[in-house]
């Protein structure tokens, strides 16, 4: 039962990536990446969550959620500005490689700061790997 909110947050993220992936070959109308960006903002806000913790343990989930939102959200904003197949595909890749940051945010929110940082640190590695092997 404790894991349900985190699972729903990851499911919402996965939904945004899946919605974009349906248009990564043909491109999309600009409303799709705008809608998924709105969903991503909600996911980031939910993942950051309210915390009763103090100090860096309270700041860490917010910082990681900001990192997630910046990385994935920027790609969606670019796709909204120019919703061709390449930009939509790039947004899908950003969503896939941004998942470890989201998971790290959720871990940090529960108080597992070191685990959260370790998970989030996988995101840059994933981005490097995607340059060699397609994420999709």
Model-identified regions with their sequence ranges:
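Short amphipathic, positively biased membrane-proximal segments
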Residues: 1-136
């Amino acid at each position: 039962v404790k894991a349900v909110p985190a699972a729903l947050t990851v499911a919402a993220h996965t939904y945004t990536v899946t919605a974009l992936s349906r248009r990564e070959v043909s491109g999309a109308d600009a409303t799709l990446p705008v809608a998924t960006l709105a969903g991503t903002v909600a996911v980031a806000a939910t993942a950051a969550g309210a915390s009763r913790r103090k100090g860096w343990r309270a700041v860490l989930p917010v910082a990681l959620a900001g990192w997630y939102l910046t990385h994935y959200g920027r790609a969606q904003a670019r796709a909204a500005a120019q919703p061709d197949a390449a930009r939509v595909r790039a947004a899908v890749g950003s969503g896939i490689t941004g998942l470890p940051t989201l998971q790290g945010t959720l871990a940090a929110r529960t108080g597992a700061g070191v685990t959260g940082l370790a998970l989030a640190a996988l995101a840059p590695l994933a981005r490097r790997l995607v340059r060699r092997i397609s994420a999709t």
